[in-house]
Design a protein with these regions (language model features):
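C-terminal nucleotide
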Residues: 1-15, 19-20, 28-31, 36-95, ...
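Residues at secondary-structure transition points
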Residues: 22, 59, 124-126
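Domain-wide signal for the mature, well-folded portions of proteins, strongly enriched
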Residues: 114-117, 163
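DPxDG-like acidic metal-binding loop motif
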Residues: 117-142
Length: 273
């Protein structure tokens, strides 16, 4: 009985959030919180989907002759089912054996409160799932292509793809939404020291994106310019220049947040500024 496990990291965007939806770059950093996807061949005559992290549970299903999942319970519109089905539809396989599929995002939740951090768990899990499905079933598709198709179907194609790219590449990257511009690897300025803080309050990314219905406002234009400016100084390798430009970018982000009523700095983030 074979077992294959693949993991992928979450991410934190240093600069370029929202601006990357247009033509500006995003600077994104992978972090050591990983989603794990495992496929285990077993001798039960049923497929099992085990979820760890988001509402721990096990779901049973079969696959019909058309390659469609048929769940054995009657709960409708379960987000986990919908997410899993999004990937399954992309590959449309009919397994010749039975498997246990384990999706583990427990590292993306606060151990005390149980709240989600908001550091790209769905993208990390999508990349891990794409990798483990391709490896297990020898699929003729790349991890990037399968992960992007799955994630965009699940999110309604509203995201930029930066979280998928970060989970795939690791490290720190400069990412453009336009596919013609290649993602490039970056290094932090030498001797730069930093800490990552979590406000303790989760925010819905789809809800935030729904408020940005037009890119015509002045604050969005300013945010784009500052995202481009900030990305341009990478490689200069001076901490002062890095921090000065990051301060300017943060000011532009605050202006954008107020004009679009996003409350980006409302959950105690402003205390750190």
């Amino acid at each position: 009985m074979k077992t294959i496990e693949i993991s992928a990291p979450g991410k934190i965007i240093i600069a370029g959030e929202f601006a990357v939806l247009a033509e500006a770059p995003a600077i994104s950093m992978a972090i050591n919180k990983r989603a794990k996807a495992t496929i285990i061949e077993h001798n039960k005559n049923i497929h099992v989907l085990k979820i760890i992290g988001f509402k721990d549970k096990e779901l049973l299903f079969t696959v019909n002759d058309n390659g469609t999942i048929e769940w054995l319970d009657v709960v409708l519109n379960d987000p986990i089912k919908l997410f899993f089905e999004c990937l399954w539809r992309q590959i449309n396989i009919i397994p010749t054996a039975f498997y246990k599929f384990v999706l583990d995002t427990s590292g993306f939740y606060d151990e005390i409160s149980g709240l989600k951090y908001g550091i790209g768990s769905s993208a990390a899990l999508t990349v891990a799932m794409a990798g483990v499905f391709i490896e297990t079933f020898k699929l003729p598709i790349g991890v990037k292509e399968l992960a992007l198709k799955t994630h965009r179907e699940f999110q309604g194609a509203s995201g930029s793809g930066v979280d998928i790219a970060t989970s795939l590449e690791g490290g720190i990257i400069k990412y453009f939404r336009m596919e013609r511009i290649k993602t490039t690897a970056l290094e932090l300025p030498e001797d730069l020291k930093f800490k990552i803080f979590w406000s303790g309050i989760p925010v819905s990314t789809p809800k935030q994106l729904s408020k940005v219905k037009t890119f015509s406002k002045t604050s969005f234009s300013n945010l784009n310019k500052m995202a481009v400016k900030f990305a341009s100084i990478w490689g200069c390798n001076t901490n002062k220049l890095f921090i000065d430009y990051l301060d300017e970018y943060t000011d532009a982000l605050m202006e954008f947040s107020m004009e679009y009523d996003l409350n980006i700095f409302g959950n105690k983030h402003n205390i750190l500024l």
